[in-house]
């Protein structure tokens, strides 16, 4: 039998507050349970960017704080100012003449649309593979001739891939390195978002627009639909409510969020399901990725 002294010690232990083992990092967390409460009535916990928060109060508060910071942070796209202009690079390589370059530049200026590489292809002065190789040299990255057909199993939201005209090429599980192919230019903001959400490193490469189009068409056919797009929702509080609702419905254990240009990407993971939520500031937002048809070249 337990002695009165031992019973008293057990009573003290079960009533004791356990601040040292409280996992929630929120400074405003009101949950400071005793050991008994932790054993019989544990507080639900969801990991946000790897840190466990009490759900819903602490997580919603921290999520709202992060979304408010994201909505006010300046949106800057990384630009390599040291890059040699594409036309001059191709001219120095002997891949076109100065007259051909001048004609393409005049058309670009006159129409106010299209990239110089697109105009060179439109005029028949360069092939897509030649332009892709020059772009790869310009961005100091590899060029790939084709995008593997197995990219359909990728878990990156299809809408995000289509928006930034990119496709996954290869993933190394040992190094946790994801190689992403782009057409036209490298979107570093998209790469940074992928690293945050997928917990991996990324390496960019370049390929032709035709290869990206083909890869995205294959992905669209195999798209499982595990993503939701919310257009015209920019209020951080409304976004927080939507995300919290999905967390509760899915009984999620982890959530990650990242800003990517005009898009907010939220990735919610449960025991068996994974859902991607995308929030666009503009309703009916036009995608960057389209099969481009430039105006007919005319200098008259």
Segments and roles (model prediction):
Residues 4-9, 15-17, 123-196, 233-263, ...:
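Polyanionic, low-complexity intrinsically disordered segments
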Residues 6-23, 44-48:
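Short, flexible, mixed-charge glycine/proline-rich loop motifs
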Residues 12, 40-41, 72-81, 102-110:
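Short, recurring structural edge motifs at helix starts
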Residues 21-29, 54:
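Short cysteine-rich clusters marking metal-coordination/redox-active sites
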Residues 28-39, 58-62:
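Cys/His-rich microdomains that often coordinate metals
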Residues 36-51:
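Short linker/helix segments within small regulatory modules
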Residues 50-72, 278:
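Short metal-binding segments enriched for Cys and/or His
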Residues 214-231:
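Short, low-order "capping/linker" segments at domain edges
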């Amino acid at each position: 039998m337990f002695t009165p002294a031992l019973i008293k010690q057990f009573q003290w232990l079960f009533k004791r507050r356990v601040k040292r083992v409280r996992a929630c990092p929120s400074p405003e967390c009101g949950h400071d349970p005793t050991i008994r409460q932790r054993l019989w009535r544990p507080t639900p916990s969801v990991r946000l960017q790897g840190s466990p928060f009490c759900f819903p109060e602490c997580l919603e508060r921290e999520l709202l704080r992060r979304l408010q910071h994201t909505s006010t942070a300046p949106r800057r796209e990384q630009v390599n100012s040291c890059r040699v202009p594409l036309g001059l690079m191709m001219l120095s390589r002997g891949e076109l003449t100065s007259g051909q370059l001048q004609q393409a530049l005049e058309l670009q200026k006159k129409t106010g649309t299209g990239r110089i590489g697109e105009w060179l292809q439109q005029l028949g002065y360069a092939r897509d593979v030649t332009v892709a190789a020059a772009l790869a040299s310009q961005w100091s990255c590899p060029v790939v001739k084709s995008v593997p057909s197995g990219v359909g199993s990728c878990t990156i939201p299809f809408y995000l891939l289509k928006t930034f005209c990119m496709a996954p090429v290869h993933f190394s599980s040992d190094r946790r390195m994801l190689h992403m192919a782009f057409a036209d230019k490298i979107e570093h903001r998209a790469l940074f978002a992928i690293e945050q959400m997928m917990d991996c490193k990324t390496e960019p490469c370049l390929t032709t627009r035709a290869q990206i189009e083909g890869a995205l068409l294959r992905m669209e056919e195999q798209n499982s639909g595990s993503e939701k797009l919310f257009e015209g929702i920019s209020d951080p509080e409304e976004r927080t409510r939507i995300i919290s609702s999905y967390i509760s419905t899915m009984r999620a254990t982890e959530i990650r969020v990242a800003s990517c240009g005009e898009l907010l990407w939220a990735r919610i993971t449960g025991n068996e399901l994974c859902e991607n939520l995308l929030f666009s500031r503009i309703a009916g937002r036009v995608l960057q990725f389209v099969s481009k048809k430039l105006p007919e070249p005319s200098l008259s």
